[in-house]
Amino acid sequence: MSTGPPSGISLVSMTTPRKSGQHTPESWSKWTHPSIEPLFTKRVMKPLPSWTGAFSLVSEFFTHEHQVFPCFNAPAFMCLLGQQYSVECTESPAWWVSLNSVLAIAQRRRAEAAQSAEAEDLAWAYASNALAGTWDILMRSTQLSSVQALLAIAWFFIGTPNPQPSFMLVGCAVRLAHSIGIHVESQDPSISPAEANLRKKVFWIAICLDQELCLRTGRSPCHDLNAGYVDPPMDSLDETEITKTVDGHELNLFQSQIQLAVIQGAIYRDLHSGKAPPNCIADSVADLLQKLENWRIEFAPTLTHDSTVRCEHHGLMRLYLSYYNAVIVVSRAHSLAYWVSPNHPAFSALPSSMRDSIENCLNASRCIIELSKLIPVTWRSFHWDIISILMSAVVILCIMAIRNPMNELATNDMGSVGDVLHIFKTLDEAYGNTYLTQVQKVCEKLYRKAHYAMQSSNAQPVESVDVVSPALEDSSNANQQQARHTDSTLEFNPNAFEQTMPYPLPMGWDLDTFLWTPTI
């Protein structure tokens, strides 16, 4: 475990108290060449709302988002907000980005509740204000508030049709956190306990987002917790960070996110990194599944594949889906051959441990789709956030139906897949020209192949099989005719697919071409 940065400068900074008049970490990064100075001119794409409007939006942010994204200290943020609307207005680029990100997030929530395109455009206008200030942060602003600002605008983009900026912004936030040293325990005596706690909190928010996004996409995380670890801010239990479940139980959502992020880091390290042991995959999978089960017992004891779950706080629903996605990623590692090999053995001929892994994948996929059915249709940003998780569930259930079409649960599974395809179709029609168009093509083709396999197992002639997705029945007759008669000409290139969307095939799927070759 790292005990601190190795440079001589860092050793001096840790042992020398800060004095007024000395250079601060902020001032070291201020130099720029005159040719690029115009880039840092403050650009206002959309004027800020009135004081009343801004106060209302910021208050809503801390009421609805703070539990899942406790990146800011509410009293301090409100104090800066008051200064923004007074003669003491700060010119900090980090504050400008943070404020507009908070306004954008809160305004988007209003827009979704009202189903108003005009209100949504206003949210994007505030987001453009925030983006206009990111250059200044990335090139000239190295302080804690800069990390907070990057995380805030990244949080906005996570729930959009293009999550690519969120990957880059979170990565930059982690690197900026490294540059100011919040990835290690500070030895600076001038840092107050409150500031030290906030530094820990911001660090762990960056880690939670980094680990979550990387596990979804198969990319390596920006920070290795084995190389730099800071104890979580366990004493942070103020009531603004407590979430109540529908059953009345109280939960610190942030603490549960931290513990899951630690497990997610172990998943990548033990199963996917160059450090992963090559010959003991079964032991690693068993250990990771036990860690996930321990997490579930502590933070989500009612979350089982046979339990009835109700719609919870959006942060809690996201946490549940992240948990099930982690179960899939871990279990899939032990049963990969079954999912992707064209010469797979029969399910009954597999070792019991591999059969258990397959069942884990199936149960988690069913739970993911059941949870998705509870999400209100107005939560569009939430739906965009979980596209890759839903796609993983669809891929697993469809492959299982292709592999074992006589499975007694196959019909119900395909009904659930149809529900997800309807969600995809609704989102794609609302926005269009997004990576979801390609996701739909992949999922719909697997869906049709699964239906064909199920109907063929009943000894129906191939010519008489109708493989049009029920989720697409409201399409025009021309589209239905095309789906029936041109499916055999569809070709799928996974490499080309990944180049057209921000997410690769979920969980690093490397599907062999046999799954995509024509069958009808």
Curated annotation (Swiss-Prot):
Where is the segment annotated Disordered? 1-30
Where mainly located? nucleus
Q: Which GO terms describe its molecular function?
A: DNA binding; DNA-binding transcription factor activity; zinc ion binding
Localization, per the record, is: Nucleus
Asked if Lyase is a keyword of the record, the answer is: no
Cited InterPro entries: AtrR-like, Transcription_factor_dom_fun
Q: Does the keyword Nucleus apply?
A: yes
Q: Which GO terms describe its biological process?
A: DNA-templated transcription
SMART domains for this protein = Fungal_trans
**Which GO CC annotations does the UniProt entry carry?**
nucleus
* UniProt xrefs under CDD domains: fungal_TF_MHR (cd12148)
Q: Which UniProt keywords apply?
A: Nucleus
List the PANTHER family hit by this protein, alphabetically. ABC-TRANSPORTER-REGULATING TRANSCRIPTION FACTOR, TRANSCRIPTION FACTOR PDR1
Protein's job? Transcription factor that regulates the expression of the gene cluster that mediates the biosynthesis of fusaridione A.
The name on file for this protein is Fusaridione A cluster transcription factor fsdR
